[in-house]
Structures are given as structure tokens and as C-alpha cells.
UniProtKB/Swiss-Prot annotation:
One of its GO terms (molecular function) is N-acetyl-gamma-glutamyl-phosphate reductase activity. GO terms for biological process: L-arginine biosynthetic process. Belongs to the NAGSA dehydrogenase family. Type 1 subfamily. It is found in: Cytoplasm. The gene is argC. Pathway: Amino-acid biosynthesis; L-arginine biosynthesis; N(2)-acetyl-L-ornithine from L-glutamate: step 3/4. The lineage of its organism: Bacteria, Pseudomonadati, Pseudomonadota, Alphaproteobacteria, Rhodobacterales. This is N-acetyl-gamma-glutamyl-phosphate reductase.
Amino acid sequence: MTYSIAILGASGYTGAELIRLIAGHSALKITALGAFSKAGQSVAQVFPHLRHLDLPALLQIDQIDFANIDLCFCALPHKTSQEVIAALPSDLKVVDLSADFRLRDPDAYEKWYGNKHAALKQQAEAVYGLTEFYRDDIKTARLVAGTGCNAATGQYMLRPLITAGVIDLDDIILDLKCAVSGAGRSLKENLLHAELSEGYHAYATGSTHRHLGEFDQEFSKLAGRPVQIQFTPHLIPANRGILGTGYLRGEAAQIHDTLSQAYANEPFIDVLPFGETPSTRHVRGSNFCHIGVVADRQPGRALVVAALDNLTKGSSGQALQNANLMLNIKETEGLMMPPLFP
């Protein structure tokens, strides 16, 4: 069986990544592509690297007929996404890649994103889309909220450790190095090549990054009490990838065993041998996440290091993984291609 797919926000980086991934999928066919400023253009005009694909032209979203669409990916910015999704047919399956439906508490959304939520009905039904931990809920969901790429990285590192109680919850420091594509495709002065190249810097310092809302929500739920981590992201002059380092209080060997057992049967999460650390180069363009554990020289302290591609496992790949579950397709379909190298 072939399912008809629409992608809204198809002219951005995550939209392009969805097109690339679905092009190799045996059960999905892209029948509609929505955009705003680039509506009316062909995919070849917007993304020359995809010109060999037989795809529809980009349309204004209100021009799309959703009657025969089986599932819609929404890759629009937050705030815009909730407005668009609220107007879609109420029985249409949707995977949202924005931040609009990740936080269950409307007050938390307003705190982190600066505006009141305008689609509370949809927010209440949304399922958090961290696939490996919400698999059963995702299978029956109508609306799935994709995680933030930073939030996904940190949770793959820490969730099993919090559940198992093998780390000090009041002493978690998370440092992430993030590629520039995570900031989107729109023109920003600080993201120009001459402004970004040959250096990197911390941003959203003082634990102010919006993805902390997801960490607070998910880690506190796991622990059964409030958990607040210290988190600082850094912008690096790379196109793809996130490298996360967690500084933790706990026994390194026990931490490694816990992660290895938690992910033993997960097709996309690979825990490296004890003492090895991952590289973003080894997951580039793939839906894989590599995790390593190293003992610190201080007794009772450990490092957990994770690498994933922010556009794939951190966003569009995870979205496709969720869509597979929602449509009762094999979860790994279209996602097992190896990373790009070099």
C-alpha cells in the first residue's frame, strides 16, 4: 500500500530533508508540498540537488486539497505551525516538527516561547515524539510533536540514567555543540559565513535555551520531582550535527551498562564500547545516534557523549520514524541508509 503525503514548510532545511528521506521510502508518495514565499516554484528551483525527483510544485498551503492526504508533515516555524494545524481536517494524521506541541503545559509554552498557545485543543491531544520512549502512544496518535534537536540529544543521553537512578539529579551539566542548520534557512546576519566561520560561541547562556522546557518537562516526569539541569549550547561553523557532553555524578561503568541495556534493541541508538566517544562525522546524514561513556579522573564522576545529525535523527528522520509507526509501516523503513562519509 502507498500512502499520500503532504509536507508543509517544504522550502526549509527540515522540509528538504523530509523530501530526501521519503524519496527512498517504499510506501510513501509526496503528493503535495506547501510553502509561503517560495510557493509557485518547482522543487528544482528551490533545491537543485533534488531536481531528479518527480515532485509537485510548491503551493500556498490554502491551495492544497487535503481530502486524499493520509499524513501531513508540518515543518513550519513555531506559532505559524499551530495556526496552520488547527485549520487542517480534524481526522488528518499530522507530524509537527515545530516547538508548538512539545510542551503539555500552556503556561510553560508561554514562558519559553513568549506567546499564548492558540491551539489548545490540538495541544491537549498531541503525543511527544521521542520515538524510542513514546512508541506505543505514537502508534495510535493523530498528532505527534517532534522534539527539539537539542532536547533529543540530551534525552538520549540521560533518560535511561534518570529512570535507573544511577546519577545525581541535582548535578547534571549538559554542553552541546550545534551546527548552524539548526537555526533554520532564513537570512540572519549572525549566521552569515563571514560572521560564523573560524570561530564558535555559546548562546542562550544562563540556562535560557527554549529546549530547557522539554528537559524540565520530561526529566521531572521521569524522576517524579522537579529536575533542572544546567545546559549551554554552542554554535559551531558546521552544516550538520550535534555533539553533546554530559558531566555527571555517578559510576561510569554503571552508567555505561545502563545505557547499553536500555538501547540494546533500538535500531538507531548505538552505545559505543566503554571509553570510546562518538563523532558527528560518523552519523552525518543518518538517523543514528552514537553514545559513549568515559570515566573522569575524579572518582564517582563520568562523561556521557552523544552525536547525532540535527536535521535527521534530531528532526526529519525522527519525524519519518514516527510517521512509519502512525501508518503501521515498519519503523525503520526509509531510514537505514548509512551515514555520509567523508
